[in-house]
Every structure is written in C-alpha cells, then in structure tokens.
C-alpha cells in the first residue's frame, strides 16, 4: 500500500487531528514528520472525550496503530513524558509509540534563547510560541544538535552538550545578561528523562519502509500548515520546518515515490495565530462570530486566533505546492445561520487584480480581498452524514470551494466528533 500525507492547507489549526482520527482505524501506522510542541491537535472521540496532543501522533488514540515520532520532529523530552503520562492516566495504551533515533532533542538552552530573543526583538518579534523550536532547528542545520540516539551513548552526549554550551552560554550571558547553564546538570537531567523513552527509540526509516513493502498503510501527519512552511509560507512569519507534503518524505525517511495521496485539510473559513499578513482577516462582528462559534483558540498557546473568510487564493496555492489530491473541509457547521458567506476569489494589489499568490510578502501585505458572495443557510447541519443531507446552499458552498480550490472535497466535517463527518469519496479505497 502507498503512503498518505495529511497536511494543513492554510495557517494551521485546520482540523488535522480529526482527519487523522477518522482514518486511524484503517491504517497501520501514523507518523508525525515535522514540528514540535509548538502545535496542537484536538481529537474528540465518539465517547465525547477530548484529547489535546502536541508531540504524539493522533493515531495513538486508535487501538492497534503503531505511531512514530519521525526524524523531522524536534522533541522536548519533558513535554513528551508529560504527554505520555497524561494519556496513560486516562487509560490510553501508548505501548505502540516509537521515536526515530534521528529526531532532534529540544534542550533547555533552546527554550531560554527563544524566550529572551523574542523579548529582545520587541515590536519586531515574529510571534513564536517561545518553546525553543526555532533554536533547535537552527542547531540541527548548524550540525550541533543533540539527537535522540545520543542518549544511548553517555560520553558522546556529554561531549556534544559541552560543545554546544560553550557557544550558547556566551549568547545567554554576554548578549542577554542571563545565567549560564551547567553542562553536567543538563546532561544529568536529560539522562533521567531518557529513562522514560529510551525503550521507544527505533530505526524508523527501516520499519516504515518494511511496513510499506508488507502492504501496510502509513499515514504521514503534518503539523501547522502550508502558509507556515519555512520555504513556501508567509516568511518570516512561519515555523522553522516544512509542513508541506515535500517535508513528509524528508521527515519520515519514506521515499517520495511511496506517496500516492496528499490529503489537504481546509477549514471552511480561514484562521491564523500570531503575526503576519492575512488578507481576509475580519475585525467586525463577523470575525467575532467565527471566533466564538468556531471556538478559535490555540490548542498549544491558548491565544485567540485571527479569523477571516475563506481564501481561495491560498487554497489554490496549497493545492499547487503540495500536489493535493483530495481535500477534507472542516467546520462547515460554523457557517450555519449566516445570511451570506463571502469567499475571497482573488486579490487587488495597487489597483491590479490577481487570482494567484503574490510573489513577494510586501505585495501580500498590500493585497485587498476580492469577494464573491455566496448565499448562506440557516439549518443545523451537525447531524448530516451524507452529502445530500446538507441544505442545498451548503452543498453549493462546498461545490464552489471545490471548484476554486483546485482539488475535490472528499470529506466534510460538520462538528468536532469523529462521527460528525460526511465522506463523499473513500480516500483509502480509491487510492489503494
């Protein structure tokens, strides 16, 4: 069986956890391939139980599925252990969670530098979560990072931490006037934490490719979204990794020819957290309505999300840069009771109209949305389970979004629960 990539097609928070949870019972492996605990997935089980996950793949909530934290993820050991304990305390079996030996570990000095840098930047700050994700990826690229496998060799670990702190302490003390970190204490603390996860360390590349050879299905789960990709997003207001489909192969060790389906998760309106351009952002009662009705607060940060109407320009862009084959449209139910629903079909920049993503961020910052008004619907759609159960105007909205986004809408979310989903096309069956 081929691998399936699940990606966010906007600025994150599209509902990827719901999609993974829906597919989880029909796949054998779920892999998180990038990011860290700077993002969160919310999963609501049929029982009504609500789980917020930050590092661990959403498939952990589906019995029998093997979950992998891939080499592209940066792992805060303390957060990992805390999340595991939280799941186990609620009766979740975590025995089938594995961690790639090549994933990088987020160290105390990454968090310290991230926080003081953000404060130092003041009004020029990017708006990071302050969890050390960026500094950890910086060390990875600079070839001075600490990898999961390093905890298996105490001498090697001590040498690497000491070398890293020779520089990091200079930054903390001389630039930011903070206390230096003691290498021995950092190593001792990490080794204590490693006792809680060393039995999970694995050669993930080998296991995943063996699974595909054996005919098993692997779901590659991204965090954040396309417009937060360090290469293809609204730079510099982005994350430090590649949430796009191209990052799935790199962050998991699965070759790109193994991937057949790219499922884009697309919210029926648009949100983003933090700073950066957002052409359809609303500052009126409509924005307040979307925020309140959609419960738009970050799983990880608790920050209120900025809200706006659906933006077909970024949806088409996401389709193109990810090679999206299918869309999962979420939170359609939030739009119920609106008289009309505007949809952005293009931008006007300096008097010129375009239907494509601007090449420069300065152009995107000046972009004014060009709207197409679609009729709304008043009916409660949360109990709909077939496409024909939806009101005609809701169906028309979906079909129009499908047309302007450039890929078929195969699934539709009409509520937070796993069962509150309309499946128009069976992605696993048709792509097998």
Curated annotation (Swiss-Prot):
Function description: Plays an important role in the de novo pathway of purine nucleotide biosynthesis. Catalyzes the first committed step in the biosynthesis of AMP from IMP.
Protein name per the record: Adenylosuccinate synthetase
KW Ubl conjugation (keyword) present: no
InterPro entries to which the protein is assigned, alphabetical: Adenylosuccin_syn_GTP-bd (IPR018220), Adenylosuccin_syn_Lys_AS (IPR033128), Adenylosuccinate_synth_dom1 (IPR042109), Adenylosuccinate_synth_dom2 (IPR042110), Adenylosuccinate_synth_dom3 (IPR042111), Adenylosuccinate_synthetase (IPR001114), P-loop_NTPase (IPR027417)
Family per similarity comment: Belongs to the adenylosuccinate synthetase family.
UniProtKB keywords: Cytoplasm, GTP-binding, Ligase, Magnesium, Metal-binding, Nucleotide-binding, Purine biosynthesis
Name of the gene encoding the protein in the UniProt record: purA
Catalytic residues identified in the record: 13, 41
Positions bound to Mg(2+): 13, 40
Pfam families per UniProt: Adenylsucc_synt
Subcellular location per the Swiss-Prot or TrEMBL entry: Cytoplasm
Organism, scientific name: Mycobacterium marinum (strain ATCC BAA-535 / M)
SMART domains referenced in this protein's UniProt entry, alphabetically: Adenylsucc_synt
CC cofactor: Mg(2+)
Keyword Cytoplasm among record annotations: yes
Cleaved signal peptide residues: none
GO terms of molecular function: adenylosuccinate synthase activity; GTP binding; magnesium ion binding
Cellular component terms per the entry's GO annotation: cytoplasm
Binding residues for GTP: 12-18, 40-42, 305, 331-333, 413-415
BP GO terms, sorted: 'de novo' AMP biosynthetic process; IMP metabolic process
Residues the record lists as binding substrate: 299-305
Assembly information from the UniProt record: Homodimer.
Pathway, per record: Purine metabolism; AMP biosynthesis via de novo pathway; AMP from IMP: step 1/2
Substrates-to-products reaction catalysed: IMP + L-aspartate + GTP = N(6)-(1,2-dicarboxyethyl)-AMP + GDP + phosphate + 2 H(+)
